Every structure is written in C-alpha cells, then in structure tokens.
Amino acid sequence: MSQPRPGHRPDCNGADPDSNFASMTHSARPFTEVVIEADCWQAEASAEATVLRAIETAADAVDADTGGAELAVMLTDDDHIRQLNASFRGKDKPTNVLSFPAAQPEVQPDGAPRMLGDIAIAYQTVRREADDEGKPFDHHLSHLAVHGFLHLVGYDHETEEEAEEMEDAERAILARLGIPDPYAGQDRVS
C-alpha cells in the first residue's frame, strides 16, 4: 500500500492468525496486491481472484494510464473500515469500500513505480448488502472493486453528472464480467 500498512488485524471473530498476501502478475495493467487483512474473508475462497479480475477488467476498459502502476486492495472488516472512515471522511460508521488515491510527485524518480493508491473493502458490509439486495457476493464484491478502482483513476460521484459518468463506466465494466447492472431499479445516487 502507498501508506505504511497498519498492523495485522484479527479475524472478524477476534482471533489473530497470520495475514495472507497475493498479487497479480505484472503486465500493461497495474500491479495489484491484495492483502487479506481479516480472516472473515476466508469464507469467500474466490475473493482474491474476484478482486483481481475486476481490477484487470476495469483497467482494460478505462482511458487511464495504469500500465506499470501499483495499487493495493485491503480486504478488511467493518471495525477497521469504520476507523478509516472516521479518520479520513469524518464518518464514524462502517462503509463498503474506501479509496485512497496516491498523490503523484511532480517528478517520478527513475525506476520508481507509480502508485495509483489503495482500496479498502469491508467483509461484513459487503456480505450484508449482497444478501439484502439478493445479489451474488462475488458480483457485489466485483462492483465495489471496480468502484474503488475508478476513484483511483479520477472518477467521482459528487455531482449528478459525475455520478452518471461513474455509474455508466461501472455498468460497462461489469457487463464485460457478465455481471448485471447493479443500479437497475434504483434511483441515481450522487
């Protein structure tokens, strides 16, 4: 991750096993490291592969220079994401996904990788939302990974126009993954 990594988090039930790390092979896409920080994610054996596939597909779909760049995705729990949400957004509650775009130096040192930033995704919130919305867990996880990635490459949803552009990009990327429109039947949110 672009900032110092926080200490290992226990699993979602308070145990403290070792973290698991995985990464995608280097190519024209960004190098993506997935850090499974909370063991509750072990219930979803394909979570890592799902996130990597979503990021690869998003990188292929958007007009952004991501080749050779690096990003990290932290699969965490509601408690940790609540702390991050409180610290960085002033909202003392869990959320499904947070993105932290990296500040880009004016001059990149030779040979230094360009950092896109970090994404954090909370298991319990993702599980609850998927269940409440009747969506497969991997579809919702893919959507949130894509959403987080789009924030790292400059998309936002602060205005109605931005939200429409971002949601259209999400729909197109998810369609490439064979995932139905996550906004079908919903009012637009900004």
UniProtKB/Swiss-Prot annotation:
Gene Ontology terms describing biological process: rRNA processing
Keywords per UniProt: Cytoplasm, Endonuclease, Hydrolase, Metal-binding, Nuclease, Ribosome biogenesis, rRNA processing, Zinc
Location(s), subcellular: Cytoplasm
Cofactor list: Zn(2+)
Residues where Zn(2+) binds: 147, 151, 157
Region feature Disordered, mapped onto this chain: 1-25
Domain of life according to the entry: Bacteria
GO MF entry, a single one: metalloendopeptidase activity
Thylakoid keyword on record: no
GO cellular component terms listed in the entry, alphabetical order: cytoplasm
EC number: 3.1.-.-
Entry's cofactor comment: Binds 1 zinc ion.
Pfam families: YbeY
Keyword Cytoplasm appears in the UniProt entry: yes
UniProt function note: Single strand-specific metallo-endoribonuclease involved in late-stage 70S ribosome quality control and in maturation of the 3' terminus of the 16S rRNA.
Family the entry assigns: Belongs to the endoribonuclease YbeY family.
Protein name per its UniProtKB record: Endoribonuclease YbeY
The species this protein was found in: Rhodopseudomonas palustris (strain ATCC BAA-98 / CGA009)
Gene this chain is encoded by: ybeY
